[in-house]
């Protein structure tokens, strides 16, 4: 916050800006709606691919909003299994950049509270419901990992005509469709057929192919079938069992199960679509490491979520500029040694600091004529006339 205040032309005391953030009436959902519309207009998409995931931000203070002893399911080397941290649930939009690179642009985040009945599943559903008014009736596909693949979240999404692709537990109860009887019998018709056992899964046809996923070409072994998921109350899903070949260890990885409610999709397409979820992991890393999320100090949940929304908005706009403004970007002024190289969000952020630091926006607005004239740049000397 201090760095943000120091970057503007201040006309009030420092405390005024802190109080503006703490007592302001800015609603995070309105900011999220406006941000979503900007992304949708800049990068039109026939189908909206949304990603939902959670992350932990370590905290020393036990009195910080939402700070508690939480389980770290990342299982990183030399890291404790439980730590004092805040848990955030984020909803982002998956977009494709140059060379097919996958990005996730954060739209809105919510802090998991310390007390109450609101858990991550309820918050994730609330985030989708909050963005529904600005989705403009477009087809929506939501991607998430195994933790969010629960009936409590998936069934309400399906009732909203949304599509879901997610990883599930390998022991998820799956059944073949029931056999259609030529002659009707008495009683209720069967919902499930034969249960899928490990033996029946191994008996499925195997397909081996090479796909470029997660940044490299990988050899993948696939098995797929259309089955009925019991935790979804018998809804048909396309089940894909996939294993990756580890060239270093010369062995296959453990089998992972992906479920897609779009049964018309092929196993290859499901794998490609689910790989777009991984873009949220570098997003969390960059927000924590380079965009100050690790240093959020606000002592009230509402203020903390507001500043998190401001940081997410800044990150999304920077990444959006790197995707749509590459041809007109002044790379020879910002970083001439990076000429003819792909434009990154870091270069855009550097240009924004050079262009807008110390810019007196209030001086550019004429109250008498109600006309805004872009003020003279008085920050970085490279942009002075």
Model-derived segments and spans:
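Short amphipathic alpha-helical surface micro-motifs
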Residues: 1, 31-34, 70-74, 88-91, ...
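Gly/serine-rich nucleotide phosphate-binding loop at the start of the catalytic core
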Residues: 1-29, 35
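Amphipathic alpha-helical interaction elements
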Residues: 6-9, 40, 275
